[in-house]
């Protein structure tokens, strides 16, 4: 797993909320 992917996923989740 890449850290960038994790950050991107977290950012998307945060943006969604």
UniProtKB/Swiss-Prot annotation:
InterPro entries assigned: Bombolitin (IPR012534)
Cellular component terms (Gene Ontology): extracellular region
Compartment(s) of residence: Secreted
Single GO term (MF): toxin activity
Modified residues (Valine amide): 17
UniProtKB keywords: Amidation, G-protein coupled receptor impairing toxin, Mast cell degranulation, Secreted, Toxin
Expression sites by tissue: Expressed by the venom gland.
Family the entry assigns: Belongs to the MCD family. Bombolitin subfamily.
Function: Mast cell degranulating peptide. Its mast cell degranulation activity may be related to the activation of G-protein coupled receptors in mast cells as well as interaction with other proteins located in cell endosomal membranes in the mast cells.
Protein name per Swiss-Prot or TrEMBL: Bombolitin-1
Lineage summary: Eukaryota, Metazoa, Ecdysozoa, Arthropoda, Hexapoda
